[in-house]
Amino acid sequence: MGNCCWTQCFGLLRKEAGRLQRVGGGGGSKYFRTCSRGEHLTIEFENLVESDEGESPGSSHRPLTEEEIVDLRERHYDSIAEKQKDLDKKIQKELALQEEKLRLEEEALYAAQREAARAAKQRKLLEQERQRIVQQYHPSNNGEYQSSGPEDDFESCLRNMKSQYEVFRSSRLSSDATVLTPNTESSCDLMTKTKSTSGNDDSTSLDLEWEDEEGMNRMLPMRERSKTEEDILRAALKYSNKKTGSNPTSASDDSNGLEWENDFVSAEMDDNGNSEYSGFVNPVLELSDSGIRHSDTDQQTR
């Protein structure tokens, strides 16, 4: 009979086997549980240290209140379940309020970000418009107002091209004025010696100068003489030296020994009617005429 009472009593308490029960007095927390060893049922108590409860982070069990202990003793399990449901609803309501608050804060943050981006974009557009207006009406470095018209753009382009051309042209003139070939240098020496030895005035010189549009005088480099022309000049000079009885000149002084006719500057026309080459001495014709006269004198001597 006693075993049956114990079995019924502990069968009801088996459902609440994991629940905690605080026993008054003593100072320590005590737990009780039931276990069956064969047919005999015994109660075992475990005395736990309070510090162990704080050190166990995984334990989420809350201690039983006095009302719950009374309800357990009186077997009012429905009231315990109702109280737990009310507590769960209260917790869920608080969580819902917190979630709604977080959602509103996030929406306000997103709205503020969108508004800031819209304001930044508007400021950027206003700044670009202001810069465009300033560039359109602000005076440039040349003191002229810039305009977006096609004619003004074309004129400014022409001015830029002209300035670049002037710089390039001045650099080319300065470089070409100092470039002289060896034949040109010897020709310049020849003209200098001819001026000093001849009795003609400065108007009879062979200074070929070209006056460009900027008013600068630049000497045109002379064409380099070929080998045939040098041979003809050398033969003409040798014959003239033999005729006058002077000492023969060396091959290096042939170009410097060239003499000009006294009637170099003349207004006579040549056979073709061109006065451009009038006054120049043709060494080929001179050589042929002198050769014919020399052969005639030899025949008369014989």
UniProtKB/Swiss-Prot annotation:
Q: Does the keyword Lipid metabolism apply?
A: no
GO MF annotation terms = AP-1 adaptor complex binding; kinesin binding
- Where does it localize? Golgi apparatus, trans-Golgi network; Late endosome; Early endosome
- Post-translational modification remark: Palmitoylated.
| Swiss-Prot/TrEMBL GO biological process terms | negative regulation of cell motility; negative regulation of receptor recycling; negative regulation of substrate adhesion-dependent cell spreading; protein transport; regulation of Arp2/3 complex-mediated actin nucleation; substrate adhesion-dependent cell spreading; vesicle targeting, trans-Golgi to endosome
Q: Which Pfam families match?
A: AP1AR (PF15745)
| InterPro entries linked to this entry | AP1AR
Recite the UniProt keywords alphabetically.
Coiled coil, Endosome, Golgi apparatus, Lipoprotein, Palmitate, Phosphoprotein, Protein transport, Transport
Compositional bias annotation for Basic and acidic residues: 221-233
Please give the coiled-coil regions recorded for this protein. Answer: 80-138
| Segments for region (Interaction with AP1G1) | 78-138
Ranges for region Disordered: 188-258
Looking at the record, which segments are called Sufficient for association with the Arp2/3 complex?
199-215
Positions modified as Phosphothreonine?
T228
User: At the top level of its lineage, which domain of life is listed?
Assistant: Eukaryota
Positions of modified residues (Phosphoserine):
S29, S226
Quaternary data:
Interacts (via coiled-coil domain) with AP1G1 (via GAE domain). Interacts with KIF5B. Associates with the Arp2/3 complex.
Function noted in UniProt: Necessary for adaptor protein complex 1 (AP-1)-dependent transport between the trans-Golgi network and endosomes. Regulates the membrane association of AP1G1/gamma1-adaptin, one of the subunits of the AP-1 adaptor complex. The direct interaction with AP1G1/gamma1-adaptin attenuates the release of the AP-1 complex from membranes. Regulates endosomal membrane traffic via association with AP-1 and KIF5B thus linking kinesin-based plus-end-directed microtubular transport to AP-1-dependent membrane traffic. May act as effector of AP-1 in calcium-induced endo-lysosome secretion.
Among PANTHER family, the record links this protein to: AP-1 COMPLEX-ASSOCIATED REGULATORY PROTEIN
User: Which protein is depicted?
Assistant: AP-1 complex-associated regulatory protein
Instruction: Tell me the organism.
Output: Homo sapiens (Human)
